[in-house]
């Protein structure tokens, strides 16, 4: 190890130091100052990540700390994207002005640190430690409200199932090591290319199960809905903005530039992608709670992105487009939802919202329609790019055609629950004697909602030029991904 290697990890070291300082400061200062310090620290991490990517021109892969960390153009960009996601989540929490203990912001910093190191892991050891750091921190965020029975139940379910997925991943890592005598993540790319024995392929499949569990892909999704339902709204925003982005970027890097060529694993992931789209969209149709509806909706969206990730890996810019679009839409949605209390939140409580808070009602409806992917709203472009990529790929028609037909059919389902939300907000009457109290004024959340609206409009006109724009970003970072 040398000082040059530590300089590469400056954003992570700064984030770790900020988390430790915030943990100590919380003992002597008010919790609000710790929340502000955490948000500022995430902003500094974004700047440091940008500076590190622009100044460190890497012509080839650089292995740091004896291979534990992989430093490439892709990992630099992924680290910066995860840092921006953490900054957005911190801003949402800060602007919501939640009266919670200072440890919430500190745990968010540690979870973001785990996500940032996860996308740079070059060794199975660092990958597993980063994954567990993020998972354990997420478990603390879920059960932060200790007086809530639902939160405790959700955290217990998340913890037990996370432990199960960790055991499966560790067993897969042991199989990969036993058959390939290597623990570098690059070994998986050779195995997934079809140049390994059955045991090594099975080990890779078990490792992928751990990543798919983190994404809540069917059939590894049973924890997500109840966990999101019981967690605080700010924690749910963090999961959908930060953790989900990190898991997708990690999966693309594990697959590599050429994608998965091992047909058994490739067709298996395409199958679970179709099931995710089906279960997610149909499951959201039955929900009366907004948290559970969003959980199922995000499970359904994974059915579109996963096939492109495993087919093209890091060579597809559509993955980055989806990550950025997901940020904007989720930040837009939670800029509305964070105005409410964490408990309950049934759709019926939105009745008559347009009378007391017309802007909030409009923002909620339009953001949900964007999340559903209706043309010409922002969410339709990633789905279009993904389906186009599947159709133009080398997948046999007997596999691609049923998948495309299925996701196109279930893509109609979101219109029903989106229109139901619009009906409740604009046409339903509040319960007798309940009324709809005016929401407290949150200037910060309103600014975030307006910014997300403007970004959505701009992105609509620039969506077809995203490849050119992202190539410019790669050029600024001094190379190719």
Swiss-Prot record:
InterPro entries: NADH-Q_OxRdtase_suN/2, ND/Mrp_TM
Subcellular location, principal: membrane
Enzyme class: translocase
EC number of this enzyme: 7.1.1.-
Topology versus the membrane: Multi-pass membrane protein
Single GO MF annotation: quinone binding
Substrates-to-products reaction catalysed: a quinone + NADH + 5 H(+)(in) = a quinol + NAD(+) + 4 H(+)(out)
GO cellular component, one term: plasma membrane
Keyword Transcription: no
Annotated localization: Cell inner membrane
Database matches in Pfam families: Proton_antipo_M
One GO process term, biological-process aspect: ATP synthesis coupled electron transport
Top-rank lineage group of the source organism: Bacteria
Positions of transmembrane segments: 9-29, 39-59, 76-96, 104-124, 158-178, 205-225, 232-252, 265-285, 293-313, 318-338, 359-379, 399-419, 443-463
Keyword set, alphabetical order: Cell inner membrane, Cell membrane, Membrane, NAD, Quinone, Translocase, Transmembrane, Transmembrane helix, Transport, Ubiquinone
Subunit and partners: NDH-1 is composed of 14 different subunits. Subunits NuoA, H, J, K, L, M, N constitute the membrane sector of the complex.
Family: Belongs to the complex I subunit 2 family.
PANTHER family linked to this entry: NADH DEHYDROGENASE
HAMAP family to which the protein is assigned, alphabetical: NDH1_NuoN_1
Purpose of the protein: NDH-1 shuttles electrons from NADH, via FMN and iron-sulfur (Fe-S) centers, to quinones in the respiratory chain. The immediate electron acceptor for the enzyme in this species is believed to be ubiquinone. Couples the redox reaction to proton translocation (for every two electrons transferred, four hydrogen ions are translocated across the cytoplasmic membrane), and thus conserves the redox energy in a proton gradient.
Record's protein name: NADH-quinone oxidoreductase subunit N
Organism: Anaplasma marginale (strain Florida)
């Amino acid at each position: 190890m040398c000082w040059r290697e530590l300089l590469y990890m400056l954003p992570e070291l700064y984030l770790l130091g900020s988390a430790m300082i915030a943990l100590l400061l919380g003992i002597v200062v008010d919790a609000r100052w710790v929340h502000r310090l955490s948000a500022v620290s995430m902003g500094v991490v974004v700047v440091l990540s940008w500076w590190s990517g622009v100044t460190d021109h890497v012509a080839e892969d650089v292995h740091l700390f004896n291979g534990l960390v992989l430093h490439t153009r892709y990992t630099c960009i992924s680290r910066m994207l995860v840092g921006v996601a953490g900054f957005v989540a911190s801003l949402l929490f800060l602007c919501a002005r939640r009266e919670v203990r200072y440890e919430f912001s500190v745990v968010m910093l540690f979870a973001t640190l785990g996500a940032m190191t996860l996308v740079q892991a070059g060794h199975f050891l660092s990958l597993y430690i980063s994954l567990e750091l993020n998972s354990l921190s997420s478990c603390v965020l879920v059960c932060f409200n200790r007086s809530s029975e639902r939160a405790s139940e959700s955290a217990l379910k998340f913890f037990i199932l996370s432990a199960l997925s960790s055991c499966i991943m560790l067993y897969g890592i042991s199989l990969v090591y036993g058959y390939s005598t290597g623990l570098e993540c690059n070994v998986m790319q050779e195995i997934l290319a079809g140049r390994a024995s059955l045991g090594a392929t099975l080990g890779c499949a078990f490792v992928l199960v751990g990543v798919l569990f983190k994404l809540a892909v069917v059939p590894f999704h049973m924890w997500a809905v109840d966990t999101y339902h019981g967690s605080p709204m700010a924690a749910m925003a963090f999961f959908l903005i930060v953790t989900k982005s990190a898991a997708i970027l990690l999966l693309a890097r594990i697959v590599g530039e050429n994608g998965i060529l091992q047909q058994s694993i490739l067709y298996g992931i395409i199958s679970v992608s179709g099931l995710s789209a089906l279960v997610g969209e149909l499951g959201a149709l039955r929900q009366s709670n907004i948290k559970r509806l969003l959980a199922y909706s995000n499970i359904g969206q994974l059915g579109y992105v996963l096939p492109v990730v495993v087919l093209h890996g890091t060579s597809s810019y559509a993955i980055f487009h989806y990550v950025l679009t997901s940020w904007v839409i989720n930040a837009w949605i939670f800029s509305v939802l964070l105005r409410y209390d964490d408990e309950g939140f049934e759709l019926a409580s939105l009745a008559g919202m347009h009378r007391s808070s017309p802007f909030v009602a409009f923002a909620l409806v339009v953001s949900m329609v964007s999340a559903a992917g209706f043309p010409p709203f922002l969410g339709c472009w990633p789905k279009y790019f993904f389906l186009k990529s599947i159709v133009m790929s080398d997948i046999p028609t007997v596999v691609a055609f049923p998948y495309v037909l299925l996701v196109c059919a279930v893509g109609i389902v979101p219109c029903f629950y989106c229109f139901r939300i619009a009906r409740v907000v604009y046409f339903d009457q509040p319960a007798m004697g309940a009324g709809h109290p005016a929401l407290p004024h949150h200037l910060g959340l309103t600014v975030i909602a307006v910014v997300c609206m403007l970004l959505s409009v701009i992105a609509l006109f620039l969506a077809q030029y995203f490849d050119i724009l992202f190539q410019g970003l790669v050029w600024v970072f001094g190379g190719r991904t």
